[in-house]
């Protein structure tokens, strides 16, 4: 995580904790000429627009005080949505038995992408059952090789 994102997280996390919300992710991204600071929050049952607005207002106030980002940016606060990213240990543990999408930094057994059910997670290895054509295959993916992971919608 970059130094700027660490500073932003230090500002945001006490706010989300105070409001009994989970800080899911923070992203600082450039799109075209504009920069966006995106904060994703959640709680059991999901968050509503009023909770997003409350976090946005409090974060904006604190960011103006400490000013860790020097350039102009747009602040966005939202739910992570149905395809929530899996980043923290707890995210992976909560995703066991759910449908997930995982990509790796390098090929593992000839693959860099898996989409299937997360059967287990022991802190170091993800075990995913995928369907390859008509047969089910169980794959083991070392956590340190995972580039990105998220919940997925199964069609």
Swiss-Prot record:
Pfam families: DUF150_C (PF17384), RimP_N (PF02576). Keywords: Cytoplasm, Ribosome biogenesis. It is found in: Cytoplasm. The keyword Cytoplasm applies. Its main location: cytoplasm. InterPro entries: Ribosome_maturation_RimP (IPR003728), RimP_C (IPR028998), RimP_C_sf (IPR036847), RimP_N (IPR028989), RimP_N_sf (IPR035956). One of its GO terms (biological process) is translation. Belongs to the RimP family. Required for maturation of 30S ribosomal subunits. This is Ribosome maturation factor RimP. The lineage of its organism: Bacteria, Bacillati, Bacillota, Bacilli, Bacillales.
């Amino acid at each position: 995580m970059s130094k700027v994102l660490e500073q932003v997280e230090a500002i945001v996390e006490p706010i989300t904790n105070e409001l009994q919300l989970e800080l899911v992710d923070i992203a600082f991204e450039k799109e075209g000429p504009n920069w966006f600071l995106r904060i994703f929050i959640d709680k059991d049952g999901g968050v509503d627009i009023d909770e997003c607005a409350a976090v946005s207002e409090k974060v904006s106030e604190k960011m103006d005080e400490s000013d860790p980002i020097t350039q102009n940016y747009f602040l966005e606060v939202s739910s992570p949505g149905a395809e929530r990213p899996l980043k923290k240990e707890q995210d992976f543990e909560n995703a066991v038995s759910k449908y997930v999408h995982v990509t790796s930094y390098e090929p593992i057994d000839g693959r860099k992408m898996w989409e299937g059910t997360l059967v287990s997670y022991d802190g170091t290895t993800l075990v995913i059952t995928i369907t390859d054509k008509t047969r089910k295959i169980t794959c083991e993916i070392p956590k340190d090789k995972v580039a990105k992971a998220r919940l997925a919608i199964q069609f």
